[in-house]
């Protein structure tokens, strides 16, 4: 695998992961942001705070990528989080796109060890995916619709083995931000139908 191919792959993955994060965030209602499912668990608002602060810290300290913006939005409501994360992560995407393929293979500090930037970036992606998964559970507990992140959900049709479709809430960051100003787009979800939506019902 060439350095350029690896860089293009990482950047393309980051772009889709950014949209997935924004899409999950968009499914929460304003009143949901304070929901705490257990005393030691983060609320949705705290997960959004963590995502913004953590990604800002990793990008500045491990990749030297500055956005020129504060880590957090001026107000901690859902629309402000959506706009701010979209803006900051887009700026990071553009800055990373200007780096050459060899840059990704160079080592950087990863807490108390040194790893290649590509290695660290993969950890950043899965770190974000981990917390996004936690938020998806909160959506289910709150009774909110569960659109696809990577594949079918019980709401989009059940199990992949039963030929359930993948239904994303948004196809682009631009449409998401535009629609969320006016209540959002809510594509119809068919539900699981007659077959069980889980493997061991």
Question: What are the residue ranges of the model-derived segments?
Answer:
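Extreme N-terminal tail/first-helix region
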Residues: 1-13
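Surface-exposed helix-capping loop/turn segments at secondary-structure junctions
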Residues: 27-34, 94-105, 141-147
């Amino acid at each position: 695998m060439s350095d350029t191919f690896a860089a293009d792959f990482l950047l393309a993955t980051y772009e889709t992961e950014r949209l997935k994060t924004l899409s999950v965030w968009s499914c929460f209602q304003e009143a949901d942001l304070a929901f705490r499912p257990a005393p030691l668990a983060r609320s949705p608002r705290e997960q959004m705070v963590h995502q913004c602060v953590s990604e800002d810290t990793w990008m500045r300290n491990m990749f030297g990528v500055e956005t020129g913006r504060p880590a957090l939005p001026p107000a901690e409501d859902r629309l402000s989080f959506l706009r701010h994360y979209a803006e900051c992560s887009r700026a990071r995407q553009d800055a990373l796109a200007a780096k050459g393929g060899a840059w990704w293979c160079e080592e950087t500090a990863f807490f108390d060890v040194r790893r290649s930037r590509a290695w660290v970036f993969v950890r950043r992606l899965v770190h974000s995916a981990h917390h996004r998964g936690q938020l998806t559970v909160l959506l289910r507990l709150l009774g909110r619709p569960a659109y696809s992140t990577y594949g079918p959900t019980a709401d989009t049709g059940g199990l992949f083995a039963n030929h359930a479709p993948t239904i994303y809430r948004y196809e682009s960051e631009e449409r998401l931000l535009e629609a969320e100003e006016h209540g959002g787009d809510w594509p119809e979800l068919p539900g699981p139908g007659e077959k069980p939506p889980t493997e061991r019902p």
